[in-house]
Design a protein with these regions (language model features):
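Generic alpha-helical propensity signal that fires on short helical segments
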Residues: 26-34, 84-86, 117
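Generic alpha-helix signal with a bias toward terminal, lower-confidence helices
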Residues: 22, 26-28, 41, 45, ...
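A common structural junction motif
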Residues: 30-40, 88-95
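Charged interaction segments
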Residues: 44-205
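Short, extreme N-terminal segment that most often corresponds to the first beta-strand
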Residues: 1-33
Length: 205
């Protein structure tokens, strides 16, 4: 019997356009609920873990919230990327979506010194336009860099760092606009896998 090697946790809040209805959300998320072996979004919305809210759509607040774990393999990456492409069409602004892969076959207590877990992490970005996606990428980078450097510098000293990040993203945006005008695919990805050291704790909300 096949045993999925990972528990995959998907986490994020995506603002949606005010006219978006549940049927559109279900269609956009179809790649991941089909991956989970479900026949509808409703039947897949519950997480593997009862303490996690799962997949929720608020028609009042126009927000799609995901705090959801599913058993799976590396091929889930394609499913979530397909879902993100569809969510771009109904998103109202840029938002990040975190996807964490937990190696359920790895036991830290029993592993030898040369064994490593296959835990992994990827960050996806969703937005109605390339500019909206770049904006949320920029905001996250500024937050992370400032948070790290504030341990050693006063906040006022970090203005040149923020300006440098802004210049980098301004250059990327100009390249993107130019490539779209020329009908060429833009350089650089809208997000991808990131690798961190050590096992990350699971999100619990």
């Amino acid at each position: 019997m096949y045993e999925a090697p990972f528990e995959i946790h998907v986490h994020g809040e995506i603002p949606l356009r005010s006219e978006v209805v549940l049927a559109q959300v279900q269609e956009a998320l179809k790649p991941i609920w089909v991956y989970a072996g479900a026949k509808s979004l409703a039947s897949a919305a519950r997480s593997l873990y009862e303490e996690e809210p799962g997949i929720r759509f608020s028609a009042t607040d126009h927000v799609l919230s995901l705090c959801w774990t599913v058993a799976g393999d590396e091929d889930f990456r394609q499913a979530v990327e397909d879902a993100c492409m569809a969510l771009n069409e109904i998103a109202s602004e840029g938002a990040p979506l975190e996807v964490s892969f937990y190696d359920i076959q790895f036991d830290e207590d029993k592993a030898s010194s040369d064994e490593e877990s296959r835990d992994d992490f990827m960050m996806c970005f969703i937005g109605p336009t390339p500019a909206a996606i770049l904006q949320v990428q920029r905001d996250m980078m500024v937050r992370d860099v400032v948070h790290m450097m504030e341990r050693h510098f006063d906040a006022a000293e970090l203005d040149p760092v923020v300006q440098a990040i802004d210049q980098l993203f301004a250059g990327r945006y100009e390249s993107l606009v130019l490539s779209m005008q020329l009908g060429k695919p833009p350089k650089g990805s809208g997000g991808g896998p990131g690798h961190g050291g050590g096992r990350k704790p699971r999100h619990l909300h």
